[in-house]
Amino acid sequence: MTGQSPIEVSAVVLRDASGQVLTVRKRGTERFMLPGGKPEAGESPAQTAVRECAEEIGVDLDPEALRTLGVFTDAAANEADRQVRGTVYVHPAVPVVAAAAEIAELRWLDPSAAPLPQDLAPMLEHQVLPALRDLPAED
């Protein structure tokens, strides 16, 4: 890794009634990750998460319903030799209609699947999914 600062992002865990986690794949990439992205000037991590979910998957999240899962650092999925630091939230289930903006594909993932798919972003696989395994599905 280079000496550059980590790329700051916010992301949201959305789970269905069975506990599956919504993942997205951005156009021109191969890795699945949580919906979310980089902040715009002056945005808080929570504001970034809400805006990105509206843009990427067409859902309006309630900022008051966001619960912080954690802040995780890992290898960036789509930028070689970079780290990403993500503030990750959990939000109650909302209807997800379709991919929008730069999202090419949506996929629901069983976080307890073994083995996990090989096309997951490092932070999702190494940090977020292990943190989720201890939470009830409805959180």
Regions found by a protein language model. Name each.
Residues 1-2, 137-139:
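Actinobacteria-biased recognition of intrinsically disordered, low-complexity terminal regions
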Residues 1-21, 38:
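Conserved N-terminal beta-strand and adjoining loop/helix that marks the start
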Residues 14-15, 23, 91, 108:
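Conserved hydrophobic "DFG−1" position in protein kinase catalytic cores
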Residues 26:
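Short loop/turn segments immediately following the C-termini of beta-strands
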Residues 34-69:
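The catalytic Nudix box helix
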Residues 72-98:
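Active-site-adjacent beta-strand/loop module that shapes the phosphate/pyrophosphate-binding cleft
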Residues 88-90, 98-136:
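NUDIX/MutT-family hydrolases
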